[in-house]
Amino acid sequence: DYIPEIQGFKDITLEMLLNMCSGLDCDGFMKVANIYFSTDLKKLINDYHIDRDPGKEYEYQNVNTLLLCMAIERAIGTDISVFLEKEVWQKAGMSYDATWSVDSKQHNQVKGFCGINAAPIDLAKFGSIYLHDGYYNGNQIIPRQWVRESFCKYNKLKDKDGYYYSYSWRITNANAFVAVGFLGQY
């Protein structure tokens, strides 16, 4: 409902996108490369289609996070990087500005799937927010309930590296969490 111009995805929920179980076909390195190097991500989205029942099978795919970012931007009425700056970066008192890559100057779609370019100290602060139920320096930055739900092992199946996946985090057997991206990005 948030992105009506994209056809064929009406059975996919925001929670499915968060948990990488949308059923979208994204197999192969070429699709990964195409989404990363695309200069028009909104147009590229229409090349994807559902090939499995949404909500049934976990498979990490960048397109899930891209769609999630696009839906969030529609819901909040602003660029997700502006929202992150105001609601997290400023409230937590991060040490340095961060940037988020976009597909092109012409289309300016945030590449939500390939992370935030931030200083290590600020990434550590972000991790600390999650370690402390959404609090940093006594301030509630992220709702406690959201943080707790993030670690509920939504997907009962592990990926090839032995992680569960829940709300954009990888969860280990030791009840630890980590953000690991494509080809070992952290």
Give the label of every model feature segment.
Residues 95-96, 101, 147-186:
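Active-site Gly/Thr loop motif
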Residues 28-29, 73-85, 134-142:
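Structural helix-adjacent loops and short alpha-helical linkers that scaffold large soluble proteins
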Residues 1, 17, 45, 58-88, ...:
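Alpha-helical scaffold elements that line and support the substrate/ligand-binding pocket
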Residues 8-12, 36-38, 51, 117, ...:
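Extracellular/periplasmic catalytic domains that process cell-envelope and extracellular macromolecules
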Residues 6-8, 53-60, 109-117, 178-185:
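Solvent-exposed loop and edge beta-strand segments that line ligand/cofactor-binding
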